[in-house]
Amino acid sequence: MQNNKDNYLKFTKMDKKSIRAPYDQNDLSKKIQRIKKREDIFLLYKINNIITEHTLLQPKQRILIAVSGGQDSICLLRILFDLQRKWSWKLGIIHCDHRWNSRSKIQAEHVACLAINLQINYHEGIAIESVQKESIARLWRYNVIQSVAISNNYTAIITGHNASDRIETLLYNLMRGSGLHGLQSIKWKRNLCFSHFTRSVLSKIKFSFLVKKLKFIKTFMDHEDFQGNHFFFLKKRKQLHLIRPFLETTRTEIRNILTIWNFPSWPDVSNKELRIRRNRIRHRVIPYIRIHYNPNIDQTLVRWAEIVQSETFYLEQLTNYILFKIEIKKKISSISLKIPLEQLRKQKEPSEEKLNFYQSAIPVDLLRSLPVAIQRRVLKQYIYINTNRILGFQYIEQIRLSCLFSLQDSLRKFLHRHRCRPIYLSEHISTHSMKSSTSDTCIDWKGPKEKKKLVTPWLIFPGGIKFLIRKNYLFIFSPKNSSLTIKRPRIEQ
């Protein structure tokens, strides 16, 4: 019996060894390859679902891909190339050479070789002079991409911004003190903001003017030589969108996919320079938080940015709806006040006849009935519509307090809260606060001595923007023209 047990144990040991040997060499490698293939397919499936869920792209669309040569843009190019058969896209590649170093030319040749191998149209923009500042280089890069997209009839521009870039932008804006609009960081899809030349010159060329000058304008648009490149029409410019489908994919996932594909990429040397703030956030702040506070900080911040973006979109739509209702109630399309600026400056209290021209003003009673967050957004959007300028939080809060309380109370409360120097002045008063935290607000009166009340019709802000609170209405004056103009709010669909 003992011999039988020993033989059985020997047999089982030999049998296990015989089973393990081929499994360690062949089956394990096949299993690893299977996992890699699944990870590859999973990323394609993920990007395809993101495009469908957020309606980023449409079938048979002309797409321009911004490829810098780094791992993000190279991975994006490969994924869109694999999805091209399903969606029937017409792809194009654009590369911008900033001439920051001597290797930029080799990097451009590397991207051009990829375009040739994939048989995709290639466009390249080269800077005449090397730009050292990142902000100026970014503006130049976007202007080049927009001009190429408009002239070649592309309807979408895709960049390789990923979840890691979104987290870095969120933390950077948080340290700067941005609001919800800055905390949502990078959006999935947005309309491109065109250059000053496009907004000021090209938008003035209207179709009706061309019909009068060119009787053959209808055949001119459909001519084969132009191939639909009507870059001067506003309809074409409104169709151009900037899309980022990688906002849920981290930089480590992209790096792993490129190692699986064995696809060449060109790393950006400037990403390692710690003198740049974003690089310090990338290499020092985020790893420190990941080690000492939350190892899953990337997923947490991405989820937070998505929540902030959806709630910000709701608040923006609600604000536009309120402004639209104010406009419908007043039945105003566009009104101009034909009174010279000098006459308005001389008057301390405008007459009721002149105030009737300000029919698109915001009712103060309506503003008081809204929540505080909506009050600030309505004021900020209303000011931007009429003056094309964005005021900071302290100025918006100042106007809001002036609407809710009397001018004197709001002035004292605001200066006592912020302990700051004068922010708004008038023709008769100037205000300032003392350095001591316990002292009261000091008010210097420069007007006639017999008047003791702190009453002035105008609130003057930086840039010459003036506000008037009169008859329970808030009126606005923009210094661009010599007369008061009121524009119709632009409601986004």
Swiss-Prot record:
Principal place of residence: plastid
SUPFAM superfamilies per the UniProt record, alphabetical: Adenine nucleotide alpha hydrolases-like, MesJ substrate recognition domain-like
E.C. code: 6.3.4.19
Catalytic activity line of the entry: cytidine(34) in tRNA(Ile2) + L-lysine + ATP = lysidine(34) in tRNA(Ile2) + AMP + diphosphate + H(+)
Disulfide bridge map: none
Top-level EC class as recorded in UniProt: ligase
GO cellular component, one term: chloroplast
Superkingdom classification of source: Eukaryota
Listed GO MF terms: ATP binding; tRNA(Ile)-lysidine synthase activity
GO biological process terms on file: tRNA modification
Pfam family, one: ATP_bind_3
Keywords, in A-Z order: ATP-binding, Chloroplast, Ligase, Nucleotide-binding, Plastid, tRNA processing
Listed InterPro entries: Rossmann-like_a/b/a_fold, TilS/TtcA_N, tRNA_Ile_lys_synt, tRNA_Ile_lys_synt_N
Subcellular location: Plastid, Chloroplast
Residues that hold ATP according to the record: S68, G69, G70, Q71, D72, S73
Role summary: Ligates lysine onto the cytidine present at position 34 of the AUA codon-specific tRNA(Ile) that contains the anticodon CAU, in an ATP-dependent manner. Cytidine is converted to lysidine, thus changing the amino acid specificity of the tRNA from methionine to isoleucine.
Family: Belongs to the tRNA(Ile)-lysidine synthase family.
Comment on protein domains: The N-terminal region contains the highly conserved SGGXDS motif, predicted to be a P-loop motif involved in ATP binding.
NCBIfam families recorded: lysidine_TilS_N (TIGR02432)
PANTHER family xref list: TRNA(ILE)-LYSIDINE SYNTHASE-RELATED
Protein name: tRNA(Ile)-lysidine synthase, chloroplastic
Organism ancestry: Eukaryota, Viridiplantae, Streptophyta, Zygnematophyceae, Zygnematophycidae
